[in-house]
């Protein structure tokens, strides 16, 4: 990697963040595209966020990525938000456009780009969970022309989830159906008519649990996706594949959301195939 007086910085900002594989992805991309840049991980306290954002301008950085807990906290310090960032209410990428700081959320775009030969326009989706990743997938699906979305959460989370879905409807005119995960017959009915089933919960990270009962029957044409990438094959994906359904883990989402950010910063396409090969060797 070339480092000199002209090298521009990018960083991922969160707490904790030292475990992040974003530096691996972006530094490979800088090198492969002959871009004079370097990408680092900054683990900061909340009290340092304002100064961190100021440093984007001060050091003429490409910009930053953000992870928890700063995706929402950063918004007041930005000059402008993209459509999807405004809908989601969270930012994962800040772009420095000649001193103007613009907030984007590339998670949803990254998710849909990682699905092989699939477009969400006119399709039906069942989504498990309503956290940060789920919100980004929801908003992007609406922007991309999805025809129906059924969101399933635990009954104790229904009250907390509804205000965000109401806000989405106010802003887009699109009504999302909210259902309790405990109602298995309703879950089965919604999955049966869906084109895409997504686990956007953390259930399965232990390598043992699954967010849905194993007696659920999947339609033959259903594509199944999990936002988790460690383990590489969750019990949820294993179960879907055992029924003969195509299934995709979360590593592609991580790569393609990074590729979206990289293009916003540099104007260049990330060599995703080359980096995907390196990632699968590292995590499979």
UniProtKB/Swiss-Prot annotation:
UniProt-annotated catalytic positions: 71
UniProt keywords, alphabetically: Amino-acid biosynthesis, Aromatic amino acid biosynthesis, NADP, Oxidoreductase
UniProt-listed Enzyme Commission number(s): 1.1.1.25
Single Gene Ontology BP annotation: aromatic amino acid family biosynthetic process
Catalytic activities: shikimate + NADP(+) = 3-dehydroshikimate + NADPH + H(+)
UniProt pathway: Metabolic intermediate biosynthesis; chorismate biosynthesis; chorismate from D-erythrose 4-phosphate and phosphoenolpyruvate: step 4/7
Pfam families, alphabetized: SDH_C, Shikimate_dh_N
InterPro entries (alphabetical): Aminoacid_DH-like_N_sf (IPR046346), NAD(P)-bd_dom_sf (IPR036291), SDH_C (IPR041121), Shikimate_DH (IPR011342), Shikimate_DH-bd_N (IPR013708), Shikimate_DH_fam (IPR022893)
Positions contributing to NADP(+) binding: 83, 129-133, 227, 250
Residues reported in the UniProt entry to bind shikimate: 20-22, 67, 92, 107, 229
Subunit structure: Homodimer.
Function, in words: Involved in the biosynthesis of the chorismate, which leads to the biosynthesis of aromatic amino acids. Catalyzes the reversible NADPH linked reduction of 3-dehydroshikimate (DHSA) to yield shikimate (SA).
Family: Belongs to the shikimate dehydrogenase family.
PANTHER family for the chain: BIFUNCTIONAL 3-DEHYDROQUINATE DEHYDRATASE_SHIKIMATE DEHYDROGENASE, CHLOROPLASTIC, SHIKIMATE DEHYDROGENASE
HAMAP family reported for this sequence: Shikimate_DH_AroE
Protein name listed in UniProt: Shikimate dehydrogenase (NADP(+))
């Amino acid at each position: 990697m070339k480092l000199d007086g002209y090298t521009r910085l990018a960083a991922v900002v969160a707490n904790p963040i030292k475990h992040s594989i974003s530096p691996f992805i972006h530094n490979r991309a800088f090198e492969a595209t002959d871009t004079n840049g370097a990408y680092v991980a900054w683990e900061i306290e909340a009290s340092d966020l304002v100064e961190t954002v100021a440093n984007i301008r001060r050091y003429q950085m490409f910009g930053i990525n953000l992870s928890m807990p700063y995706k929402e906290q950063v918004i007041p310090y930005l000059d402008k938000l993209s459509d999807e960032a405004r809908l989601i209410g969270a930012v994962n990428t800040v772009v420095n456009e000649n001193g103007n700081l613009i907030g984007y959320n590339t998670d949803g775009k990254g998710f849909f780009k990682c699905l092989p030969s699939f477009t969400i326009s006119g399709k039906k989706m069942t989504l498990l969970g309503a956290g940060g990743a789920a919100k980004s997938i929801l908003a992007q699906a609406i922007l991309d022309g999805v025809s129906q979305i059924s969101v399933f959460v635990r009954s104790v989370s229904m009250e907390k989830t509804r205000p965000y879905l109401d806000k989405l409807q106010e802003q887009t005119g699109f009504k999302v159906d909210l259902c309790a995960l405990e109602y298995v017959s309703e879950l089965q009915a919604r999955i049966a008519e869906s084109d895409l089933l997504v686990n956007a919960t953390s259930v399965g990270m232990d390598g043992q649990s699954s967010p849905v009962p194993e007696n659920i029957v999947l339609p033959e044409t259903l594509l199944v996706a999990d936002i988790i990438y460690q383990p590489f094959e969750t019990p949820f994906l294993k179960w879907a594949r055992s029924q003969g359904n195509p299934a995709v883990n979360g590593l592609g989402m991580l790569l393609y959301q990074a590729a979206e950010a990289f293009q916003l910063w540099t104007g260049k396409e990330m060599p995703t195939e080359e980096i995907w090969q390196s990632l699968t060797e590292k995590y499979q």
